[in-house]
């Protein structure tokens, strides 16, 4: 049954309790897409242990702030009746409850595309209500993951775990389509508690291949992610040093490119040393690069440790997914880079 979270203090120390090492699957419904000015209307979460056995559920309804006008597109999507906008907790009370949930020691917060949308929305909500916006990412052994990039990897390399829906002849990885195709939905899509329940069921499907699940968890740990990237083979040597090569996996690249592109490391960001920079190598226009046209002919990707995209080693079983045409472009670009140092 649903329950509103009972407020309790969160220790600054490393102490763990019965909730330690748990997943907190969550979803939000909002008034729009603007993280600075829109607000959360619904928050729902299901906490599980590390074997995905449910521990408890939480639901929070948030009253509309007087300075917020909901986006018509958001209202059509989440289908929350306008008459309900005046119900629920004020934003501060709701943010405080959610903050305590996500900061429970040992909590791994995750959802479907949460690192692409929900997590940043949560940070803005916490900051606006004078709550620390980042502690759920690192403090008290807390961390975060995202099921969307995990779904992409399973689609590429463990396809048998799901039925993969096609809409108008194209693969769709939208949660509602995955839920319908695999009979995971019980209720109205885009209602927070329904979506988070689907997310948990989806995770349980993936967890049947537990070795894969545990391996992918490592890509959301900064140290593990950094170690794996340090093990990538050298693809190019230059006066600047060795440049590792790999395959960057992200939803940004879409099903037409199997969600992955060949890349080579080109160093770290100067203003943000914790970010690595990667050059995409499957675009033919790269060989047209001049000092004046760099912005038009190159695609540089910023990669934060422990966050998507996922960089896979260039093993044959992964590399074959880019196809012969893109592999040929990659080889030509690599030779061009070597010749034009």
Predicted regions and their residues:
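Short, flexible loop/turn elements at secondary-structure junctions
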Residues: 30, 64, 149, 282-285
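Metal-dependent phosphoesterase core characteristic of DEDDh/y 3'-5' exonuclease domains
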Residues: 37-43, 47-80, 100-211
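Entry/capping segment at the start of metal-dependent catalytic domains
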Residues: 12-55
